[in-house]
């Protein structure tokens, strides 16, 4: 689970690549104002999940909903992309604003809201095929129709065969995902209502999840250089094949992990989706589902310092020969989970004169049984690195005899365990009130009873850590072996709390074209079960998380431009983050739990422009300053040296201060269009203390879509048009490097994640 920050800027991003956008289903669009189409599937980091719309804070986890319910309750263990894809089983998608999401779900975030294809009286089929020049093939099929006058059916199949942009020698595919949907719908009372029973089966294996790192040479000016013989995005920084010895956190036994294992996910889900329009104008919706994922597993790779060693340092290759050259201390986490949830949401709504009222209820139950084991190893710095062995004394060995080993530091870095459940019972409402033709008020509130009961191991982690009663051993200065007793057991933590959310939005038209808008939203929550998988917050650290969002600005609209400009403030208190801190210049790391605040002040201007016939442009500019507050940590390493990190008032890592988006689209003919998407991400800091950074970069997309006739559509698109070879995210092992030390790292070998390489994709769609 390893709680790593994924950060988001505050701009709502409107996209225009038509091939990726879906319309709302008719029964939903009848009850909503028409919204801009927004492409959330163009993701420069991962082809298999939606991009994360940015609001200036770490992710609040689930941001995709299906038929009004979370696609996965929590993606901390059971990953979203393992159970949901934007496929032919969907009738359409929409985008919930932070205000809407806060009231309906308790999370302040832009969220994708998707709706299932339920069918219609006549038979229809959709077959989509996609491929790229690396060998990826994707087949997506939906069949739907009617049975008699009052029954509908739908069936879908999604198959993804993605080898990635480089060959993983230990497996054929970086992502192999299968999704199957079946559903039947009963039409009620001449179309006034419907009841649908839907089944979904997912089976996903995604070893590409841990193959997204690359070594590079860091230049002090924010740029990187390629290492000879290694092309980021085109070469693998994962071994060809092999197995590793590790210490199982739960059993305390040494076991073997084969690289082809550990990324398996499969789940079964059954859902009841219904709605009914009463004669008095009230619309009632009732949606519920049960999902069980007996395997929700994934693997994480991490890095540390890259250094040069000589033969005298004792590293050996698998054939027993001595090694000299560059090595990196690598880290691996094996995550094993079982997840189930039972979710229910019901809403009633009605237009009452100039009020549009909605009242809803959530009853969401989630059960988690999860643990992870970690180990460390040393590898060569090259494509398909070779694993190196070294002399190692296992702290669980009472003889304290050194043996040659490829793995070490078992469970020293953030092994996790928790088992338990959480439940949310919430009542919420919204009202859209048209006070006058010029003045509109939207407001809402949410009150949520939250109960969590989880097993927690609060004991600090150490080399040889596992559950149970046992001894670890160390050699004293006089040569004697000293034993230390351990009794590691989980203790139950139960919490009963009230969370709340509220929102108020005011819109006033000064003229027919120009107006003012302002809104304020607040949401609160307490630490979740996933945050107890590590050492977790103590009673003193257990505090309410509060997220206020305040925005205000202007809007202007005429025949050719729709423009808005807003100033935004958002903050989050008591954010919980588990950090692995590496001692600079070494491979040694320690895990600490951090609780801190973040606040962001920014300005965003967005425009939809239609300057001439057949041409549309979306443009966006954001300037923001996200900073840490109360961010302090210290750690003591094995040699007794204590080091600290103080990131107070420093820019949050990975968040750019400048964002630009340019998305032109031109209709060449009625059935042929060309589109581009350019996104600029300004300078981002790659560590906690503003010492290392990456220069700004462009993420670029483009394509042509051709509707050949009513039955056939074709498309071609390009990702990373200019084949930019940049790094992004953080730099491994750099957490404790300060500004004063930054100059020493000019020209140093480091590692981190990278942009998706130049990719050409082809698509075809058939309707029948």
Task: Show which residues each predicted segment covers.
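Conserved C-terminal beta-signal and adjacent last beta-strands/turns
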Residues: 8, 144, 337, 543, ...
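Acidic, small-polar-rich N-terminal luminal/periplasmic segments of exported/outer-membrane proteins
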Residues: 22-122
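Transmembrane beta-barrel wall of Gram-negative outer-membrane proteins
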Residues: 124, 131-162, 166-237, 262, ...
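Repeated loop/turn-to-beta-strand initiation elements of outer-membrane beta-barrel proteins
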Residues: 124, 150-153, 190-197, 281-284, ...
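Solvent-exposed loop segments that connect transmembrane elements
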Residues: 209-256, 300-332, 379-413, 453-493, ...
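Face-selective signature of the C-terminal outer-membrane beta-barrel domain
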Residues: 265-294, 324-464, 507-509, 519, ...
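Structural signature of Gram-negative outer-membrane beta-barrels, strongest in the C-terminal barrel
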Residues: 339, 358, 362-364, 412, ...
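Gram-negative outer-membrane beta-barrel transporters
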Residues: 562, 569-573, 589, 593-689, ...
